[in-house]
Every structure is written in structure tokens, then in C-alpha cells.
């Protein structure tokens, strides 16, 4: 079915768009042209205190080789050592699987092609891949040697990660509509009704959510396990929730007065037959995402910046209600 095909290809498509990426490498081919054409910024000194706590290298080559070795080994502790405490959030998005995939992408691009460019006598950057994608964290020369300047790359890395994660969240919202249509094509509980799934994860032994484990030869469930695990409210322990490319997701079973048709409960006689909606919010505001998104079966996705208290604000959203402050995603 068309819906199953799109659902099954969601994860690789999302990975191509933006894998909650450390060092912004998953989308190297997308951003290379713009980044390469941007004028080089003037060298900015790393603070003496920060430089003193960072490992230094005799040459830029040695520094970048140490980085690649850490990424190749998936050595998170070594990455933390190279970039220091201030750079820790730059290499950890909160989604370990996506981070590891991004590190592997970096290494593959590096192995295919790489070059070091001297932006000044005391500043060097690494470009990788056939598109010569520039790594946003340069090496700068200090009294002790060459060190990674995480301050220089901070804003750029976070901006790229957020941009990709938000594109992912939008794509998930659109795929969610197909998943629910797929789900509703079959009577999943034997009550004679075609209903939407009221939750992401099915109860053990049931098909009352978008995801359930399957055996070899069985048709896949509409959603994959990683997306299903991205709902902290429905899991027994919040620590078990894993953001899906930097975002959490929750199904909504009502709509408010600002939705088409006005306020209504999608449940009729306890059965979810009148519609369904989805809410997506960043796991870490300003680190994994900025915008919160919501969509319904009408096919429209809306976005809004809920601010620093996004998690608390999202927890209060119980209905699809794109009122003032919510903008349609084009």
C-alpha cells in the first residue's frame, strides 16, 4: 500500500534530511554550497581559561586526526575531552542512535575526501567529502598549541541541528497522517469499527497503538519502534523515553475551537472514529529544536515557538487547536 511504503521509508528519508546530527554532518551535501560560499569569519580567541582545559596539538593535522579517531571509535568520552565541558552539548543531541549515525557519516565523508585550509596563520578548518563541506568547529593556535574553538562553532552547529530536527518533525507529522490511515483500514480490535490509533505504542499482545512488535513474515506495524518510544507521557518510566531526532510526540484525541469544525471530541461512544491529531515538541529547547508542531488528519501542520518553558507548555496541550500564535507550515 502507498501508506505502508511511505511509512517504511520514513526513517531513511528522515536520516537523509537531518539525523539530529552531531557536528551537523548528516546534511553535509545540503548545506555545503551555502557554507562554502560564506565569507570566513575573523579569528576569535578562545578564552585563556577554556584553552587551558582543552588538549592541544602540535599541528592542525594532528588535531583533526584525533577528532576523526574519536568519531570512528564512537568514543563519547574522548569527544568530551577534545571539546571540553563547554562543547559537550555540541556533540550530544540526546539521541544516541542518531549521534552515532552522524559520526559514521562524518567518518565516511572524511575517508572519501578531506583537506585542511588555513584561514589565517592561527586558524584552520577541515573540509570533508566530495562537496568540501566545512566543519563548523575550527582549530585555533594558542600558546600551548592548536585547540578546538567550540565557541566559534557553537551557534552554527546548534542552528543546523535545530533546522534538520524541525524538518524531521514536520515530516513525521505528515507521515503520521498516512500511518493513521493505514491503521484505520483494518478492524484492529474486532469491534466491527474502523478506528484510528489512540496511542503510539500498543498494549502487550494488542494492536491498539501505531506500533507493535512483529515476527518474521508478518506485515509491519504502521509506526516504527523508535518513533513509538518518543512519547514520555505513555511510558512507565520517563527515562525510557528516547527523543526521535530531537523531538517527543504525543497523540491528541480532541480538537479545540480554532480547528476546522470547531471544538469536538474525536471519540464517539469511546471509539476514535472522528479523527486524530499529533503534537511534536523539542526534547531540549534551543538544543534539539525550537518550534512545536501539531497536525490533524486534515493534512495541515502548524508551528509555534512556545519559548523556554516549552516542555511545560506542551504538557498542557490536550487538543489540536491551532489558534493565535500558530502558523501553518507551507
Question: Predicted segments — roles?
Answer:
Residues 1-13:
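N-terminal secretory signal peptides that target proteins for export/translocation
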Residues 14-29:
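Bacterial N-terminal signal peptides
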Residues 36-73, 117, 153-178, 182:
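Short, low-complexity N-terminal intrinsically disordered segments enriched in polar/charged residues
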Residues 75-87, 193-197:
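Short, well-ordered alpha-helical segments enriched in acidic and aromatic residues
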Residues 87-135, 238-245, 249-258, 263-272:
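Surface-exposed, charged secondary-structure patches
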Residues 124-127, 131-167, 171-174, 300-305:
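Short beta-strand edge/turn micro-motifs at domain boundaries
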Residues 183-287:
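Flexible, glycine-rich surface segments
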Residues 274-330:
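C-terminal soluble interaction/assembly domains
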